[in-house]
């Protein structure tokens, strides 16, 4: 079997979106599964829309997710350069060879002339190009040139059905005549995507083209161009094609770049970890097993088969994505989780380098099973790490839990904790249970809610006794006294 070579070739426009990264993931997984090569190529031929900022955002996204490429920008490879903007001379040479071989021709018709011919023949004026210039005489061509009329170069489409066996959708046919001769260049001679994409695939020996369903309709054009490229010696073979299902958003509409959940970095900013997001993106068209949604990337690579990709549209379900991310957070080794959480909270400006490493690791362990995304952790840990002058008590929690009936509870808690010889979780737990449950006869919720709110500022926190140990005796007692003052008002 020929070594599998797949490619991911985004245009550097805008912010990376989940559909784009799903395509990268499936190509990467197929390359790793087969022991093949994952080629990363940048399609930056649209100077008006392309940006270096977007280019670097794509690099950032792939690196964050661990989707490493074998050939491409910043890595190199035998078929470079890997940016289309640096390959212009190659494309122009291919255009010249196609023209010389009669595979392509110059077309001078304007859109207005094409529409007029359709109307005159009683056809829909929006049908598109009508192949009129295929058989222009040399005299007509010279007359157009003498008049200074620009020409696009068009490929001669075959007068026969175009059929291929799609790796996802099975046998697919476009009837003869349904795809007109299409432009390979602009009127100014600049090569178009319709030319450069297959030429790059051919020159980089791409064996499998795995891409979104939105590009399905361009496949007949690419097949016809490949046939011409093989006849002129540019291509050695025609790759296999597989079209991945649409990703749908709310209301069963195709997920748009404008939909917030489509923005890859919005998920990262919330605190998704790569394992969780990749696991969910893998499920947008593929599954490891019917009864198993949670899996690692190594498990995906071992099992990934492009023929098992579902052709039906996949719906982006934020709740399911969140749930999978929570599962992957729980699966992290505690030290790894603490490192990632610390990095996240530091990058978001919540904590600084002065936070004690052991204290942070212990705090992280308390919240690892209680969060969905890393961003959830700050609300739970703010009471420990926010500067003292920024500590506040949630007003709704205080109104409910720091009323007059909290006075005896907080007085008893202070009296129980003040004289403790040591400050460790078991000692704190024993002292509070004795003072509040045994001596005051309170139910646990009534006993501990005022303590929790006074000390953490919220009715939701990590486990109480462990939290008090980490906060320390001095701060714990100070906050209990402040809570007592509040309750007495």
From Swiss-Prot:
Organism: Nocardia farcinica (strain IFM 10152)
InterPro entries recorded: aa-tRNA-synth_I_cd-bd, aa-tRNA-synth_I_codon-bd_sub2, aa_tRNA-synth_I_cd-bd_sf, Glu-tRNA-ligase_bac/mito, Glu-tRNA-synth_I_codon-bd_sub1, Glu/Gln-tRNA-synth, Glu/Gln-tRNA-synth_Ib_cat-dom, Glu_tRNA_lig_a-bdl
Function: Catalyzes the attachment of glutamate to tRNA(Glu) in a two-step reaction: glutamate is first activated by ATP to form Glu-AMP and then transferred to the acceptor end of tRNA(Glu).
Amino acids binding ATP: 257
Intervals of motif 'HIGH' region: 10-20
Motif ('KMSKS' region): 254-258
GO molecular function: ATP binding; glutamate-tRNA ligase activity; tRNA binding; zinc ion binding
Catalytic activity: tRNA(Glu) + L-glutamate + ATP = L-glutamyl-tRNA(Glu) + AMP + diphosphate
Protein name: Glutamate--tRNA ligase
């Amino acid at each position: 079997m020929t070594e599998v070579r797949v490619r991911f070739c985004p245009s550097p426009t805008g912010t990376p979106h989940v559909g784009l990264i799903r395509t990268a993931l499936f190509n990467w997984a197929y390359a790793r599964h087969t022991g093949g090569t994952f080629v990363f190529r940048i399609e930056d031929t649209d100077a008006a829309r392309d940006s270096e900022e977007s280019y670097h955002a794509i690099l950032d996204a792939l690196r964050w997710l661990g989707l490493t490429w074998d050939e491409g920008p910043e890595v190199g490879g035998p078929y470079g350069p890997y940016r289309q903007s640096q390959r212009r001379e190659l494309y122009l040479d291919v255009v010249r060879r196609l023209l010389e071989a009669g595979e392509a021709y110059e077309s001078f018709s304007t859109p207005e002339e094409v529409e007029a011919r359709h109307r005159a023949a009683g056809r829909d004026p929006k049908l598109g190009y009508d192949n009129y210039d295929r058989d222009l005489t040399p005299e007509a061509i010279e007359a157009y040139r003498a008049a200074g009329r620009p020409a696009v170069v068009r490929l001669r489409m075959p007068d026969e059905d175009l059929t291929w066996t799609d790796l996802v959708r099975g046998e697919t046919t476009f009837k003869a005549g349904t795809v007109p001769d299409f432009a390979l260049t602009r009127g100014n001679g600049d090569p178009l995507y319709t030319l450069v994409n297959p030429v790059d695939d051919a020159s980089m020996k791409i064996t499998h083209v795995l891409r979104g369903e939105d590009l399905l309709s361009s496949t007949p054009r690419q097949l016809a161009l490949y046939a011409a490229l093989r006849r002129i010696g540019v291509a050695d073979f025609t790759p296999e094609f597989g079209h991945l299902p649409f990703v749908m958003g709310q209301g069963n509409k195709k997920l748009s770049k404008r939909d917030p959940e489509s923005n890859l970095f919005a998920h990262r900013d919330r605190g998704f970890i790569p394992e969780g997001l990749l696991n969910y993106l893998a499920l947008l068209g593929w599954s490891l097993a019917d009864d198993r949604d949670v899996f690692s990337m190594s498990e995906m690579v071992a099992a990934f088969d492009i023929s098992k990709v579902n052709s039906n549209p996949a719906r982006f379900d934020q709740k399911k994505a969140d749930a999978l991310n929570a599962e992957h957070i729980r699966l992290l080794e505690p030290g790894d989780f603490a490192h990632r959480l610390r990095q996240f909270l530091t990058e978001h400006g919540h904590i600084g380098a002065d936070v004690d490493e052991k204290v942070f690791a212990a705090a992280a362990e308390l919240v690892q099973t209680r969060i969905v995304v890393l961003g959830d952790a700050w609300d739970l840990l703010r009471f420990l790490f926010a500067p003292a002058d920024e500590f506040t008590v949630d007003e709704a929690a205080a109104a409910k839990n720091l009323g007059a009936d909290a006075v005896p509870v907080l007085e008893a808690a202070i009296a129980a904790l003040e004289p403790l010889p040591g400050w460790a979780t078991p000692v704190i737990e024993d002292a509070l249970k004795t003072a509040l449950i045994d001596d005051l006869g309170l139910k646990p919720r009534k006993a501990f809610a005022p303590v929790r709110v006074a000390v953490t500022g919220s009715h939701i926190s990590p486990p109480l006794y462990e939290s008090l140990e980490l906060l320390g005796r001095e701060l714990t007692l100070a906050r209990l006294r402040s809570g007592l003052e509040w309750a007495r008002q």
